[in-house]
């Protein structure tokens, strides 16, 4: 397992990465950690809870469980030789470790070539066959992603099955897989099954999840194949194509059989400071989520973040919204809800308000989450400002997580007290709570596949096209802040 601990560092600084690194080393299975590269992900467009510098990266490269630099997301900065980006990449290269990529733009012209020339060696943000082909042809490893809400393997694998490119240059991966997916459908075995269903030979798909990955990260002398001198990490399966796993061995020890652990996983004691990270100036009220209209307006044309099902990128949308008592209202009939980013690292009391579409909520409801890539403030989406305030205040009280309210009542809660991002409960318990959350959202009209994952990315200002940050509404295509109302820009 490869982990990029960016979330922990965004909230808990370099110390957060070290805590996750140390916990990873204590596990009976291999969990390798990449040092975060972009904290914040887009300087000038957001404020995170911390900053990672090239000196931080250089120090982390000396830690025993660090295998490289994770997800270089500031792709304009790489192409422009930004000193922070260049410094972190250089420190990684000097250490002889791998530079992970994150090029989320559809532009495969000069910006892409400049990014690749800057040093990133892999990328998982492609969605099209030509994205995968372009990365491989430029010497990168194309990582084909299947997460809980991102379905990018089927289209990109055609670079192998139709274009005939060498499968040894491709890696299968997950990204943002929630507990329900992991418990009920699996982790990498789910991705491999899916790749086989798209036409890959079983052995090829397995290779793309094992040996290809190990070689890319310089770990092939330890893992990646069942050969002498490597760790005795292997699976016993009864059906290769379906990847039905009967037993799991790690380091020669049987850890799981018939879908159940046969050894206890060691618990890690996080310090109390890691559980006190939702810092808000005060409880919020409905007024904090109000959007004042321009003076004298009866209606406005607002920019709207358009969620795209099963895809990480959003679209730029617009909607004509009514003004009532001087405030711009959301519109369930147009599928336009309120969205707010609540600052939660420095207790500034800041709330940024905008609008989002695609969730199809009905009635009076709101979802709040402190998992909000990549700076992990609090994101609240709702059709009703009172419910938005209730949801935000509930997360403040429990120390973070995700909660859903409808008609003034709490309908589902998943507590994530560690940095507001992680739970220390067993996976089965978290999965049960996550299932209840998704069901509560469905009862309020949200039929979007894995809608919570979409919610968690709405503030990720390095993935096109329109996002929200503590600085305002961000046009990622042009990397600039834009007005909420179209009239404010056009006059």
Description of each model-found segment:
Residues 14-19, 44-45:
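Metal-dependent catalytic neighborhoods of phosphoester/phosphodiester hydrolases
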Residues 1-8, 12:
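Single conserved hydrophobic/aromatic residue that forms the stacking wall/gate
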Residues 9-10, 35-41, 148-150, 212-213:
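Acidic, glycine-rich active-site loops and adjacent beta-strand->loop/helix elements
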Residues 19, 51-71, 77-144, 151-172, ...:
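Histidine/acidic residue-rich metal-binding segments in metalloenzymes
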Residues 175:
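Active-site glycine-centered loops adjacent to acidic/histidine catalytic or metal-binding residues
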Residues 27-46:
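Metal-cofactor-binding active-site regions of metalloenzymes
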Residues 183-199, 203-491:
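Active-site microenvironment of metallo-dependent hydrolases
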């Amino acid at each position: 397992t490869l982990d990029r601990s960016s979330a922990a560092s965004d909230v808990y600084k370099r110390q957060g990465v070290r805590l996750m690194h140390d916990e990873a080393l204590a596990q009976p299975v291999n969990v390798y950690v990449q040092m975060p590269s972009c904290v914040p992900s887009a300087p000038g467009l957001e404020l995170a809870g911390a900053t990672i510098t090239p000196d931080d990266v250089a120090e982390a490269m000396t830690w025993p469980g660090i295998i490289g630099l994770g997800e270089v997301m500031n792709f304009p900065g790489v192409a422009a030789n930004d000193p922070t980006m260049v410094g972190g990449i250089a420190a990684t290269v000097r250490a002889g470790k791998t530079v992970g990529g994150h090029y989320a733009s559809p532009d495969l012209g000069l910006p892409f070539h400049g990014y690749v020339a800057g040093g990133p060696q892999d990328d998982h943000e492609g969605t099209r066959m030509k994205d995968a082909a372009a990365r491989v042809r430029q010497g990168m490893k194309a990582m084909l992603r299947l997460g809980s809400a991102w379905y990018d393997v089927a289209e990109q694998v055609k670079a192998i099955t139709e274009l005939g490119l060498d499968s040894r240059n491709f890696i299968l991966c997950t990204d943002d897989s929630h507990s329900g997916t992991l418990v009920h459908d699996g982790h990498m075995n789910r991705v491999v099954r899916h790749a086989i269903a798209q036409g890959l030979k079983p052995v090829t798909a397995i290779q793309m999840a094992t040996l290809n990955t190990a070689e890319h990260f310089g770990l092939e002398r330890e893992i990646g194949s069942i050969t002498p001198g490597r760790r005795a990490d292997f699976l016993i399966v009864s059906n290769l194509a379906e990847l039905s796993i009967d037993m799991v061995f790690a380091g020669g020890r049987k850890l799981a059989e018939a879908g159940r652990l046969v050894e206890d996983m060691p618990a890690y004691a996080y310090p109390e400071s890691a559980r006190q990270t939702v810092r808000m100036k005060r409880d919020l009220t409905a007024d904090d989520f109000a959007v004042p209209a321009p003076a004298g307006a009866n209606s406005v044309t607002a920019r709207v973040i358009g969620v795209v099902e099963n895809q990480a990128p959003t679209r730029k949308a617009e909607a004509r919204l009514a003004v009532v008592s001087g405030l711009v209202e959301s519109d369930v009939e147009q599928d336009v809800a309120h969205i707010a980013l609540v600052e939660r690292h420095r207790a500034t009391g800041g709330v940024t308000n905008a609008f989002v579409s695609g969730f199809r909520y009905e009635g009076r409801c709101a979802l709040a989450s402190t998992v909000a890539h990549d700076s992990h403030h609090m994101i609240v989406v709702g059709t009703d400002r009172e419910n938005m305030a209730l949801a935000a205040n509930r997360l403040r009280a429990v120390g973070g997580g995700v909660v859903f309210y409808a008609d003034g009542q709490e309908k589902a809660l998943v507590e994530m007290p560690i940095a507001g991002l992680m739970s220390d409960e067993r996976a089965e318990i978290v999965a049960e709570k996550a299932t209840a959350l998704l069901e509560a959202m469905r009862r309020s009209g949200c039929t979007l596949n894995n809608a919570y994952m979409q919610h968690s990315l709405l503030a990720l200002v390095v993935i096109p096209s329109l996002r929200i940050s503590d600085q305002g509404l961000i046009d990622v295509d042009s990397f600039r802040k834009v007005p909420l109302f179209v009239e404010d820009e056009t006059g």
